[in-house]
Amino acid sequence: MTHSLAIVERLPGHTEVMGGFAALARELGWDVHLLFNRSDSFQFVDYLAARLGIGGDRIHDWSYINDHEGEFDAILLNTSCVWLEYGGRLQQWASSRRLMVVHHLPEDIELNPHGASLYLTPAVDPGKWIFPLYGSPGLPESLCENPHFSQHQGGVGHPELPGLVTIGALDLKDVGGVSAYLKAGGRVVHYDRHRCHFFPEERDYSQHVGLGGAEFMQSLAGQQPIFLWFPIVPESHYMVYRFSGALIMGVDLNCVMVMPEQFRQLYGFPEDAVISYQSSVMETECLGKLRDSPAKQLERRKRLAAWAGERWEKNLGIFRGLLGLR
């Protein structure tokens, strides 16, 4: 008999994370239903359904759980805020079936002690965090002969800086670093839900606004080579508890990821799998790594793919335990 899992997202946003749990459940032989807020025009659910082979009859509005909770063997609440909508029903779900709740802060458990907790960063509990992946990763067959790196990047010591891609609002991020990179002759391609007004006069800055999941992934995949930058400042919540969905795309598309060293250490990316810097992307060592040869960038991507494979197996072990499987 096939078991069924409902993954519920009440709020607009966060739907890209749902794919990580759905992929694990599918791998373990579970039937998966995705429940989300249909007012979210930027949702990833349609993309995930096509990517993971989830039929349209298993895609619902978030409120579907209110009348159909008995149909599921397990319920996963995709963000810690969601449980506020359900009140006392959480205790019922926890006692009658396996309830899982994605928490972000340690205090969330005190507010909602029902169900099994899991996390999207290892900051709270390294043994209970899952890095969302859309399947068992593998290195693209064409990677070794990818012409884009030699076409656009240049060789060792080439003065040209690669274009950097960044995803999400730049408010509360390193806007100064973005500006400095542009002034140094680099290009920045920015994806966000809303129009950014920080760089109206910069000709080497471009933005893609308001793309839905499938359109977004198609556009992002076309930005070859993909140097994906996380311009996060030291005091940001992203450095501890808050998960950046852009990380999923960085690993899934096997990008060369560029990030603060503190961020690399948080997620345990190997030093040779990403390009990291202490406080600024403009540090001499970081700029040198950005100008590395295509062969060196290929080594980083291979190492990242290996890390993702290891992480997928760890994810499976954690999720299997949460579902009560041996």
For each feature predicted by the language model, list its residue ranges.
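Short acidic alpha-helix that forms the nucleotide-activated donor recognition element
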Residues: 67-70, 212-225, 252
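A charged, aromatic-enriched C-terminal amphipathic alpha-helix characteristic of glycosyltransferases
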Residues: 153, 277-326
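Nucleotide-activated donor-dependent transferases that construct or modify glycoconjugates
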Residues: 1-12, 228-234
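Helix-loop-beta element that forms the nucleotide-linked donor phosphate-binding surface
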Residues: 112-117, 124-147
